[in-house]
């Protein structure tokens, strides 16, 4: 009980990923994002997962610190029931039980896979859309959400920006400019060709 309370206090999952916007082999994507995800092992020692969309060059990786749902059903990256969304989440949705109750009232008999707030968010995205769901959500969180229908990547943070989220363009050479993101900068540095230097032009701005 004490250990679980500490987990809730620190709430340190971690995720990373990148978007090429062009086709790349599944093997290459998995190898790269797996190495990026490994840099975040200290944030999530309980589980590791990766998910890739080779047709778009999109890769997501997650390190899990089990907080709400300790079972394998809380594994991330997680896909929605209708296969429209894939999500990685760092943080906690405090009112996810209330959101579940509201969803259960709309869809009686809906069977949940587990008790994770991540699954609750995905079901809410399906029912209400992303913006309305976020309006209803209370918590501390950083999210990367891939919409397979619109082929759009959305990065999300809580209103106070409590959970870290770094992102930017990486000049990777062969792949051109890629969009990378992660819970820590070290995850971005693990991308091949990443240049660990400061842009003086950006500093001037």
Enumerate the language-model features and the residues they cover.
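Short, Lys/Arg-enriched N-terminal segments with co-localized hydrophobic residues
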Residues: 1-11
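Cysteine-centered catalytic environments shared across enzyme families
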Residues: 11-205
